Amino acid sequence: MFLRWSPKKAALAYPVPPAPPTAVLVPWFRPAGQVRVFPKGWNAEAAAFAPAAIVGSWPQLAGLLPERIPSLTHAVIVVASSPDQLLTEARRNRLWQAFRVPIFEQVVAEDGSLLAAECEAHDGVHLESEKLSVDPRLIEVEACGCGRATPRLRPAGERTRAVAAYAR
């Protein structure tokens, strides 16, 4: 079996390097190191890879909620193409209940380039690129628990409250 490398796609930015064996279920990234891309999503080949981490969109990961994935020990990374697709608190809790591993979120472009990413402090999604357009009411500028001072989108519950407060 040959893996095709596409120079136009970025490698996955794993939240807490180094990346363990990771199954990427979206075609936005190129394989690198222990990161393998399964563009057709979760299937027998992805299961045989026995990933310690899984990367996918919310619909893909929601489809895996009833699955038992014994090798999954490190993380679930939810990728979205816009901030509007980030997880609600309820969806995040469903992933945690099903997989019992840390949940991370990333906003990425179709070429896999990182636009925003959640850190290990899980206190919002750090803005990584000026290409990402975000409602200023949803941005937190105070230092994060991870030590970074970059602006970030507030956590899901706080994003909802900020918009609701503005609407009053």
Residue ranges and their predicted role:
Residues M1-R168:
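Active-site glycine/GP-rich loop and adjacent strand/helix microenvironment
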